[in-house]
Amino acid sequence: MQVRAALTKRLSLIATKDGFIYTQSPVLDSGFADIAAGLKYNLYRDAACGRLLSVGATFEIPTGSNRSLQGNGNGEFHFFTSAGTRVGSRSHWLIGSGLREPADDNLENRVFYLSNHFDRQLGDRPLYAFTELNWYNYGSSAAAFPLPVEGGDLFNLGSPGITGNDLVTHAIGMKAKPRRNVEAGVAWEYPMTARQGLMDNRLTADLIVRF
């Protein structure tokens, strides 16, 4: 679950990670996720052209369940930037990149990522098809996890022997916008690289409500 609240016209308080992890994976159990929160600042916004640029930072507190591979380490700083533009009258391109920097690099891994999202409206209906491409590059190894396994976007395992490794995933999905303040979507994601980390494939459903 994520929560975002505007503090000013440009500055927002964001809670980007919390809630409960439900999994059928043989290597972990269901449990609570860590909590991450911080600030996001809008550097540029042009509503007429559909363009925006933002930067932000969060800190992840290791409060989650160990059985869900959460609650490890001494916390993680996340520094990021995101941008978006309207393409023509029916499409949007969004890009985000960031650095996940552990408070203790012996317990968690340093990760750089780059994510791209492209969507297109289907006719005049409030329905959008989209595709996403995500790249994770591991900048450090650690000694907290027994195996050289990458954790992707949800986990920071503190794995050994993964410095320089890359994980690339691709997702396709659909999103509906029945009202101006409501969005609902579903996506199927799978790894494209030989190294898969903890991901075989993943089905994600989301619901966004704006107040």
Give each language-model segment a name.
Residues M1, S30-I35, R51, G71-F77, ...:
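Residues that define the transmembrane beta-barrel architecture of outer-membrane proteins
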Residues M1-A5, A37-Y41, A57, F79-T85, ...:
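Residues on the lipid-exposed face of transmembrane beta-strands in outer-membrane beta-barrel proteins
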Residues M1-Q24, S30, D34-A36, E108-Y113, ...:
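Glycine- and aromatic-enriched membrane insertion/assembly motifs of diderm outer-membrane
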Residues R10-A15, D46-G50, S89-L94, D124-A129, ...:
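Repeated loop/turn-to-beta-strand initiation elements of outer-membrane beta-barrel proteins
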Residues K17-T23, L43, F59-S65, L99-A103, ...:
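Transmembrane beta-strands of outer-membrane beta-barrel pores
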Residues L28-E76:
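Hydrophobic alpha-helical segments and helix pairs
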Residues N72-F155:
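Detector for outer-membrane/organellar transmembrane beta-barrel domains
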Residues H117-R210:
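Outer membrane beta-barrel transmembrane domains
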